[in-house]
């Protein structure tokens, strides 16, 4: 089953994306480079728990 996750900006701006991932095939924490509109550049987004 796909679980909802939150991708939080590593720049410390507080910006985040929400997405889903299959925990069976990807058991580790997701890290991906995406655009942060607050910082106006690409930064690393890290997976956190969606409350």
UniProtKB/Swiss-Prot annotation:
In terms of superkingdom, the source organism counts as Bacteria
Q: Which pairs of Cys residues are joined through disulfide bonds in the record?
A: none
> Which GO molecular function entries does the Swiss-Prot or TrEMBL record give?
structural constituent of ribosome
Spans annotated as Disordered: 1-21
Coiled-coil regions listed: none
Instruction: Tell me which positions the record assigns to the signal sequence.
Output: none
Q: Name one GO cellular component term.
A: cytosolic large ribosomal subunit
Under the heading InterPro entries, the entry gives:
Ribosomal_bL33, Ribosomal_bL33_CS, Ribosomal_bL33_sf, Ribosomal_zn-bd
| Gene Ontology biological-process entries | translation
Sequence similarity: Belongs to the bacterial ribosomal protein bL33 family.
Q: What is this protein called?
A: Large ribosomal subunit protein bL33
Organism of derivation: Neisseria gonorrhoeae (strain ATCC 700825 / FA 1090)
């Amino acid at each position: 089953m796909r679980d909802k996750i939150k991708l939080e900006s590593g720049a410390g701006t507080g910006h985040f994306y929400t997405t889903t991932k299959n925990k069976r095939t990807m058991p580790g924490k997701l890290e991906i480079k995406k655009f942060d509109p607050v910082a106006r550049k690409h930064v690393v987004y890290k997976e956190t728990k969606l409350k």
